[in-house]
Amino acid sequence: MKLEDMTLDLEQQVEVKADIGDVFKGVLYRFGEGSTNPNGESMQMILEQWAGGRWFRDRGNGIGHLWGHVQVIKPPVLLELSGPMFMSYPALNHVELRLEQIAGGTKVSLRHRAIGLLDAGHREGIGKGWGHYLDNIRKDFADGVAAQRA
């Protein structure tokens, strides 16, 4: 296996028309209880919002999957998660979400870096998956859903 097949470095961004503090709360919601798959079904994710907190999928009846831990949480500008994520094989992942106040709203930048025996299917689908997360955050503020949760 070549080194380039064993590494991943993906960056995506979205602009959200809302205040940075509100968007940060929206990020926490979408990475936790508000996490859905592209079909809109709940991913049953839990995000413990403190350094060292777990990020995991709780399917009930003792069934679950640890996606990672909160490495850094610095409201309202930074959330870093590290762990196996959705990869049930030898791999290390780091996801960084940076928020920046811009004219008219907030820019959310996501960077996912990984190293390990990366599955080709995961490599191909990662961009779509994170795009879904970011698009949901943007849509929450575009249609007022996030304001209703606050």
Question: Predicted regions span which residues?
Answer:
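Short acidic N-proximal helix/loop "leader" segments that mark the beginning
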Residues: 1-11
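A short small-residue
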Residues: 6-8, 110-117
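Short beta-edge strand/loop motif at the mouth of beta-sheet-based domains
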Residues: 11-12, 18, 22, 29-66, ...
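Hydrophobic pocket/interface hotspot
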Residues: 23-27, 55, 70, 81, ...
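Residues at helix-coil transition
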Residues: 28-32, 75, 135, 139-143
